[in-house]
Amino acid sequence: GGDLLRQGIATSMGAESLQIPLFGLFGACSTSGEALALAAMCVAAGYGERMLAVTSSHFGTAEKEFRFPLSYANQRPLSAQWTVTGSGAFLVGNKKSNVKITGLTIGKIVD
């Protein structure tokens, strides 16, 4: 799971009571895809029957950490993108289903 807060605090606090292993991810817009890919690879490798891929974000936090704090009162152009305040989750498992992950693409750095 992952989020946009420093140290992945929202994910860590949300998962604490579950008492299950956790990969803490921090990839901004890519966190959902990273979590889904990691969950699919873990299930395919037999590390678990079910994996939960979770991500969350918060507009105010994203502004504070990646752009300008809201208290700075920076003017935003009408075309500016806005970070959603929300969360999403996928349950990835090894049971037969019509919904399948058949492949994924992981990037690499080329200089």
List where the protein language model places each region.
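Membrane-interface helix-loop-helix junctions at boundaries between adjacent transmembrane segments
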Residues: 48, 62, 70-73
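Conserved beta-ketoacyl condensing-enzyme motif
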Residues: 1-30
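Short glycine-enriched loops at secondary-structure junctions
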Residues: 2-7, 57-58, 97
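Active-site-proximal alpha-helical scaffold in enzymes
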Residues: 26-51, 92
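General beta-strand structural signal in soluble alpha/beta enzymes
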Residues: 1-2, 24, 53, 101-103
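Short acidic, glycine/serine/threonine-rich loops at helix termini
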Residues: 9-12, 62-67
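Short beta-strand segments
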Residues: 2, 51-57, 92
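Condensing-enzyme catalytic core mediating Claisen C-C bond formation in acyl metabolism
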Residues: 68-111
